[in-house]
Amino acid sequence: MFGEWLPAAPRERSLIGASVGSWRFASACLPDAAEGIRRLGHLYTEQNFAKGVTMAQISQSSRRMLDDLLDGRDAALLDNAHYRLNIMVVKSHGLLADDHRGRLGLGLSSVIADNLRGRARLSRHFERVIIHDPRLAPPVNTLNDFPSRFVALNAGNLRQALLASGSIPMVMEGVRDLPGAGAGTFRDGGLLDYHLDLPYSGDDIVLYPHFTDRVIPGWFDKTLPWRRACPARLQNVLLLAPSREYLSRLPYGKLPDRNDFKRFMGDAPSRQKYWRAAMDESRRLGDEFLELAANGRLGERLLTL
């Protein structure tokens, strides 16, 4: 998509993501978008963690991976001619601002309980922060579901913003005092906006390459089948998702995910083989998309979201 399809119709485009989505879009903003995304896949696949790995060790490994990915090309990423990067993070309140496992665990328990009572109650625990390319405002209307604010993205906060956006509690340390966003502890933006159920602005199509055909509002909603995205916010969303038939052909019948590090603990070569096989299959999926688009047949696959 970023290697051929979008460059064939160049224009200013907003890229907005949380967690690994922000890393993927940052990779697409590098001078060679396709190579940047391939590089991210390679670097992540090569990660390996021993049993008992600490949050500090995973954070350090993530910093090294980000260094290898950007390779000193921060300015080129920020100056991309066509893409405007938006990185979503949350500022954590109370016990969630602490990386001590006991206190953080208590804080997460409170979040889970409040989320069951109502998603709006998460405003007690998190503030949404969108760190965006200052050349273009974030592609959203007024955000009034949670306390929210915008921060300009620049060379001084790019790497910290990306690290914060991927900082899952109990897995990685939070990022302290994010430049431009003030004092505090900043974490994975997916905690609030897991699948970006946002009030998108304008009349353009929102193209959403996704790993599932369901839009789940927040990270804590994953086990709540009744918690669904707002239909009004999806009116202009075109979601691209792998079919169940495609997933069934993958090794283990699923896409690779973070839990594979535990599933293959002590056997990194098997996990890496599995992930590489899945990436090879994804390239074939991309070829099929390009063929459908070139032949005007995308409409044959459209379903109501």
Region locations from a protein language model:
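Patatin-like phospholipase
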Residues: 1-14, 27-305
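Catalytic nucleophile serine of serine hydrolases
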Residues: 19
